[in-house]
Amino acid sequence: MQAAELGSTKAPRRNLRKATGVVAGAIALFLIGGAGLLRSTGVDADAPTTAPAPEALVRSALAGDDIDAAIAALQDRLRANPEDAESLTSLGLAEVQRARATADPTAYPRADQALRSAARLERAAGAPTYQTLIGLGALSLARHDFSDALRYGRRAAVRNPYDGDVFGVIGDAQIELGRYDDAFATFQRMVDTEPGVAAYSRVSYARELQGETRGAIQAMTAAETAAGSPADAAWAAFHVGELRFRDGDVAGAARDYRRSQGLDPSYVPARAGLARVAFARGDLNKAIAGYEEVVARYPAAEHVIWLSELLDLAGRSEEAGQQRDVVRAIQQLLAANGVNVDLEIALYEADHGDRTEALRAARSEWDRRHSVYVADAMAWALHANGDDRAALAFSQRALHLGTRDALLRYHAGMIRLALGDRAGAVRDLTTALRINPNFSALHAPIAQRTVARLGGAV
């Protein structure tokens, strides 16, 4: 993946020198969702010490050790020296990791306080360090404040343009803002600077957005091969499975999910993947049981939504309603802790009842950014409110990169049907089902019934 080679999966030569320490290296974890991406800087992480350095504590936590213990140790250091900016930065990073690892957003304000305190102390001594700026960028990404993330990333790049992590912050922000050409160029620079799990996974996403599923799988497989720990490999293997599942390859996805689970039995998303495989194979009870276990261990909204829709499909409407209440409570908790959830609210409320709130949230998010998925949310919210002419324009914009996403095609088909374009509706709905006939427990059955009613064939 040398310059201008996003279409290649050949491992590149490392042509720029790494110039940062361990704390900066931690950021790759937060940006791709892995579990141990810290690079060695020549220090033996296993060597006994009486007072571990802040970055060593973060490295230990991110490599799979007790994140709570790492945070407690950093807090002890800060009680002894409240103006230890390096420990504050490390504490902020560890709190972001705790939020991600536990689906508990109450850690984000603590991360914010620690990182801003570090920046204030560093500013008094001259300027915030590269590590702190990258940490603030990672926190902004986690809270879906992509404009701020881009700002912090660019400031960090001025201080150190030789580290791959800074291009992760910048590129992730650009892609979420809908600045695709800029993002793809940034990801290429990341690959050229520091090839590895974080860089290859971004290449995979860039290819997926452009409808290149095979290339996306190749790049994510390269990420798995490059993984430096079982936890990183489990993360990448799971995402290979996600790519296959979204492309309708249930058997291949099942193999990848099981491989992920074997690499790291504690990795909950692999269990969610296997629950979706059970749904795809028609075992609704097994799918529900799988998601109940997932939600008990990791109550992220996406998992609770799947559980609620599976329960509805099984005719267990009262239990499904209880899970929908949980989804709204999660969204409220996220918002209360500084996470922007307008995109999620727009799609969820368009599906489950509050059409006015869906459109408010979609418009609010569109004012902030113009990604294909925000365009899709605008389309679906407008459709829910009966404005299908406007919805179609947004739906077409959502598809302009050529993304092979069954849900985007389903939305397009239902909008065309509402406009009386039966042929167009059949075309889009059939395409959705050919991409992935199991894309949603709620919408896939509707798509199948609608195509049959309109006389189409999948």
What spans do the regions from the language model cover?
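N-terminal leader/linker segments that initiate helical-solenoid repeat arrays
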Residues: 3-131, 437-438, 445, 451-456
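Short coil turns that delineate tetratricopeptide repeat
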Residues: 82, 123-127, 161, 194-195, ...
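TPR alpha-solenoid repeat register
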Residues: 87, 128, 132, 166, ...
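Canonical tetratricopeptide repeat
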Residues: 90, 135, 169, 202-203, ...
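Register position in tetratricopeptide repeats
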Residues: 97, 142, 176, 209-210, ...
